[in-house]
């Protein structure tokens, strides 16, 4: 009988670990900062109401990296809605227009790409030349920043083109945002009248089709969960993701996670972001 009681006690002692294998989100973020020897910025926002559910360094500046490409394509779609652009318009470019990491655009030097194809390449494959070609259509970095101001984002700024914008110097405000500002801007693009319903669906679909985000939150996503995302990476340990997430294949919340100033490898950075994502998912109903 004593042996049975000891077995039951031992089993009960393991139950909390089985129920909650991941720490609470803020505890996970603190652990990640310690393990990365860097800074983590994060916000979890309810998509419908805009209410902040979890935040850590949410008002501190972090390099945007390639996450800016979602906002860029939002600006392109706003021009489409206004009748100033067409997704079917073909853009031709030359070899000298290509920059590092252009896996899609480098294959279309002969025939060019449509505006819609460039947006798909910029978001789903993070094609840098596609982003630069699109930036030119909205007035460059200054034009994109002006668009952000027009929709009420007074924080996010783009100052340079790909690939210089990924320098990520400590304390440099250029090409930065805050988790809170990025989440609010993404919510405006996807839920307000800043974009037509058709353009909102298109922007979201490009994020659903992201093909370079596998090692991050997608790696810990349970079956039946929805995700649409865009990642970014830069020098000096910068890494980031903007995502829409939710169970029952429904986008319920916006999650923005940025890392900066860490000596960690790319694999380690990916692992920490995945860990934060796992904590959010496990404690979704907190």
Curated annotation (Swiss-Prot):
Keywords: Antibiotic resistance, Disulfide bond, Hydrolase, Signal. Gene3D superfamilies: DD-peptidase/beta-lactamase superfamily (3.40.710.10). The active site is at residues 66, 164. Residues 1-21 form the signal peptide. GO terms for molecular function: beta-lactamase activity. It catalyses: a beta-lactam + H2O = a substituted beta-amino acid. The keyword Transcription does not apply. One of its GO terms (biological process) is beta-lactam antibiotic catabolic process. The keyword Oxidoreductase does not apply. PROSITE patterns: BETA_LACTAMASE_A. Disulfide bonds join 73-119. Its EC number is 3.5.2.6. Substrate binds at residues 230-232. It comes from the Bacteria. It is an enzyme of class 3 (hydrolase). The class A beta-lactamase family has a specific amino-acid numbering system, sometimes called Ambler or ABL numbering and often misspelt as Amber. A multiple sequence alignment was used to derive a consensus sequence and then the consensus was numbered taking into account insertions and deletions. This allows use of identical numbers, e.g. for active site residues, despite differences in protein length. UniProt always uses natural numbering of residues, hence there appear to be differences in numbering between this entry and some papers. Belongs to the class-A beta-lactamase family. This is Beta-lactamase SHV-29.
């Amino acid at each position: 009988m004593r042996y049975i009681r000891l077995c039951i006690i031992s089993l009960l002692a393991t139950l909390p670990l089985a129920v909650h294998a991941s720490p609470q989100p803020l505890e996970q973020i603190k652990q990640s900062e310690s393990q990365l020897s860097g800074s983590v910025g994060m916000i979890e926002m309810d998509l419908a109401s805009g209410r902040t559910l979890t935040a850590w360094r949410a008002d501190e500046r972090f390099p945007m990296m390639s996450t800016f490409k979602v906002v860029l394509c939002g600006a392109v779609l706003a021009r489409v809605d206004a009748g100033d652009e067409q997704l079917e318009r073909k853009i031709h470019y030359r070899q000298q227009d290509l920059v590092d990491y252009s896996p899609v655009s480098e294959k279309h030097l002969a025939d060019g790409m449509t505006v819609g194809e460039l947006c798909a390449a910029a978001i789903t494959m993070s094609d840098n030349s596609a982003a630069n070609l699109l930036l030119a259509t909205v007035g460059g970095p200054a034009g994109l920043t002006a668009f952000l101001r027009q929709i009420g984002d007074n924080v996010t700024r783009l100052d340079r083109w790909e690939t210089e914008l990924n320098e990520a110097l400590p304390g440099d405000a250029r090409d930065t945002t805050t988790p809170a500002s990025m989440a609010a801007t993404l919510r405006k693009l996807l839920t307000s009248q800043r974009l037509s319903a058709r353009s909102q669906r298109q922007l979201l679909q490009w994020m659903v089709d992201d093909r370079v985000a596998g090692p991050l939150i997608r790696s810990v996503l349970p079956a039946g969960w929805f995700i649409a995302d865009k990642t970014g990476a830069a020098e000096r340990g910068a890494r980031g993701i903007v995502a829409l997430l939710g169970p029952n294949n429904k986008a319920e919340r916006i999650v923005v996670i940025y890392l900066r100033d860490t000596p960690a490898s790319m694999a380690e950075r990916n692992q920490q972001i995945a860990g934060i994502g796992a904590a959010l998912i496990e404690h979704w109903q907190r």
